[in-house]
């Protein structure tokens, strides 16, 4: 089968939005080439885990590559993707050039080549995220491994927002906590919560592909006795109370449900949010406070923030 590689040149703050647009358009795989990755490991306290080839990354901005089967409707799909991306600036998301290029590739070329982007990465004092095909030996008995298979279009959990959410969970999860993960994606945050001692984790996503991916990864990590995965839109119809809600979503989506979060989280419970570019920190904090939360801590990494808030 012939496939088309759609490459979009954009900015880091648009990565999650553009990736979501590509998934919704039916991409069979997405790879992100961010030059910030070339220096990230040297800058973090956990040391350089692996070496990256600078020739595979753009000089500036971020290159997002998605793979679509070649069909008669491909041109319409690309036009739809472009239209959706062009709307992002109206949500204060800078897209940079937004240039789109198309290349033809053979199935055997892309079906395995994307694996070069994924390697074991220690993202905190507790967790190392390991792709399923990589061999990895923990460096200490305390180190916890999360195995992920990103083959269903979700990444390996090393984006700054995911990293900050996991570190926030490390700070806050108590033995026996009940937790809801809103917009679970690959399920990585739910798996981390289970491995940190939660007694029950409800993981929800509106995207059926995400639900399938999360279910697979939950089983892979043997946390399916704690984590249940289901399809749902944010917190619609969800009853509480629970000890903690975590949501790694775009700021515009988080703004849709602070009141629901306050309803579902027990009094004194926590709401952890990320997916927030630094420029949106104030508006998210104000929305949380208006809903009755108190901001306890803000984590920062690169141009992103995560907020830990406590319910009244």
Curated annotation (Swiss-Prot):
<dbReference type="InterPro" id="IPR050078">
    <property type="entry name" value="Ribosomal_L11_MeTrfase_PrmA"/>
</dbReference>
<dbReference type="InterPro" id="IPR029063">
    <property type="entry name" value="SAM-dependent_MTases_sf"/>
</dbReference>
<dbReference type="Pfam" id="PF06325">
    <property type="entry name" value="PrmA"/>
</dbReference>
<comment type="function">
    <text>Methylates ribosomal protein L11.</text>
</comment>
<dbReference type="GO" id="GO:0032259">
    <property type="term" value="P:methylation"/>
</dbReference>
<dbReference type="GO" id="GO:0016279">
    <property type="term" value="F:protein-lysine N-methyltransferase activity"/>
</dbReference>
<dbReference type="InterPro" id="IPR004498">
    <property type="entry name" value="Ribosomal_PrmA_MeTrfase"/>
</dbReference>
<dbReference type="GO" id="GO:0005737">
    <property type="term" value="C:cytoplasm"/>
</dbReference>
<keyword id="KW-0808">Transferase</keyword>
<feature type="binding site">
    <location>
        <position position="183"/>
    </location>
    <ligand>
        <name>S-adenosyl-L-methionine</name>
    </ligand>
</feature>
<keyword id="KW-0489">Methyltransferase</keyword>
<feature type="binding site">
    <location>
        <position position="248"/>
    </location>
    <ligand>
        <name>S-adenosyl-L-methionine</name>
    </ligand>
</feature>
<feature type="binding site">
    <location>
        <position position="205"/>
    </location>
    <ligand>
        <name>S-adenosyl-L-methionine</name>
    </ligand>
</feature>
<feature type="binding site">
    <location>
        <position position="162"/>
    </location>
    <ligand>
        <name>S-adenosyl-L-methionine</name>
    </ligand>
</feature>
<protein>
    <recommendedName>
        <fullName>Ribosomal protein L11 methyltransferase</fullName>
        <ecNumber>2.1.1.-</ecNumber>
    </recommendedName>
</protein>
<keyword id="KW-0963">Cytoplasm</keyword>
<comment type="similarity">
    <text>Belongs to the methyltransferase superfamily. PrmA family.</text>
</comment>
<keyword id="KW-0949">S-adenosyl-L-methionine</keyword>
